[in-house]
């Protein structure tokens, strides 16, 4: 059976919605959904059949939606625009938190009452489960539970308890106190596994936290995690939320469909095709590098494969399992970031190269890039005698100045070729 587990992480839960949107668009169906903290809320919305409602709720989220906080204060805080009035406001709010013995969760509860429908959850054919931690004052006791074992009328309470961070005002369920389930299992794959699920997807939002992986060897699971940090969990900035929803959407496509890249989304070519491009790289472009290193009597292609590429991989801190194409794309991404190339788009390898070639240098990095354009195979010194930044940047601009034109095939050239092919194809336009 196929199930999905959503990791807890407060505002970072927006990432779940992007991943789920991409999964549902491609026909994925799940027999069960579980989660911890905000993951439990999002899982409940899936189970009750209200994904679109949940998606739009997140898309329109504002800081004041969940907490009694001034929106302008949050904007100034995010912009690091801190003045005396902000400090006074923060001091006043801190006193309220202390007086109330925690952050007021009235608005959080209102969200649950507005969106969660216990009857729909219980009537759904999908399994729903969550993790909470009971705390009796002496020791925490983890509670992993499915909907059929939650007392009637208490599903909202259990979801609320699953998200009960210690900084929140504590609430009890029938005299028992609970804290955030993330203190035990923040992404409850094993909860699904305990019910017979053997095909699992884990949607992470805090990938640095240890994941409790499935126990059974025959259980399949895919881990989808952010390509970049999602920000602070308790900051509900609408811009950040929307960006994380987009990131989730494209990270899912990258993971399931095997796209390449770390910060971009690139539909690569086969390793054999890329190897052919490297082999076709002109010897006359390699020879200046050989001369700068005092390499005599060595085949230019050996210089490329035995010197340039390994040193580039080391400078970029690429693992030993990195392919030649992986190294090439890592260089591309470094250049693309400097030029502020749009991230949330799926590029073919050649589209990505063409986009970089056509783009203008961003003002903030133009001077750096201009200096780098002067570097052409400046690798005469051994790598350990060159600072990592200098070495990496010199590679970047040699790569941008020369290798992009020879290893990459421009989209415009491809389009021209395809048009000619179309005209020659039995007369069809």
Per-region residue spans from a language model:
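Patatin-like phospholipase
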Residues: 1-36, 44-429
């Amino acid at each position: 059976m196929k199930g999905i587990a959503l990791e807890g992480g407060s505002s970072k839960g927006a990432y779940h919605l992007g991943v789920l949107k991409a999964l549902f668009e491609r026909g994925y169906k799940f027999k069960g959904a579980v989660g911890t903290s905000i993951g439990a809320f999002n899982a409940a919305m899936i189970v009750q059949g209200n994904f679109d409602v949940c998606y739009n709720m997140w898309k329109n989220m504002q800081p004041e939606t969940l907490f009694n906080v001034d929106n302008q204060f949050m904007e100034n805080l995010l912009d690091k625009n801190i003045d005396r009035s902000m400090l006074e406001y923060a001091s006043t709010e801190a006193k309220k938190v202390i007086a109330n013995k925690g952050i007021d969760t009235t608005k959080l509860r209102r969200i649950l009452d507005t969106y969660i429908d216990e009857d729909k959850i219980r009537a759904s054919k999908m399994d729903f489960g969550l993790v909470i931690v009971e705390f009796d004052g002496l020791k925490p006791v983890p509670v992993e539970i499915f909907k059929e074992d939650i007392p009637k009328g208490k599903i909202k309470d259990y979801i609320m308890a699953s998200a009960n961070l210690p900084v929140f005002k504590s609430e009890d369920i029938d005299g028992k106190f609970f804290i955030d389930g993330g203190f035990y299992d923040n992404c409850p794959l094993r909860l699904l596994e305990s019910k017979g699920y053997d095909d699992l997807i884990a949607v992470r939002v805090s990938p640095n936290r240890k994941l409790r992986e499935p126990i059974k060897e025959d259980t399949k699971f895919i881990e989808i995690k952010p390509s970049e940090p999602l920000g602070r969990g308790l900051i509900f900035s609408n811009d950040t939320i929307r960006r994380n929803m987009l990131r989730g959407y494209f990270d899912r496509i990258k993971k399931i469909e095997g796209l390449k890249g770390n910060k971009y989304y690139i539909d690569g070519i086969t390793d054999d095709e890329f190897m052919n491009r490297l082999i076709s790289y002109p010897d006359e472009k390699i020879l200046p590098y050989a001369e700068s290193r005092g390499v005599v009597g060595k085949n230019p292609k050996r210089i490329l494969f035995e010197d340039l590429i390994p040193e580039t991989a080391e400078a970029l801190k690429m693992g030993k399992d990195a392919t030649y194409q992986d190294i090439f794309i890592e260089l591309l991404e470094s250049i693309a970031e400097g030029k502020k190339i749009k991230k949330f788009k799926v590029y073919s390898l050649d589209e990505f190269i063409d986009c970089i070639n056509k783009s203008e240098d961003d003002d903030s990095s133009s001077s750096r890039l201009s200096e780098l354009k002067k570097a052409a195979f400046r690798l005469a010194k051994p790598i350990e005698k060159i600072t990592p930044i200098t070495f990496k940047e010199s590679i970047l601009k040699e790569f941008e100045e020369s290798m992009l034109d020879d290893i990459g095939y421009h989209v415009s050239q491809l389009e021209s070729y395809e048009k000619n092919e179309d005209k020659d194809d039995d007369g069809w336009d």
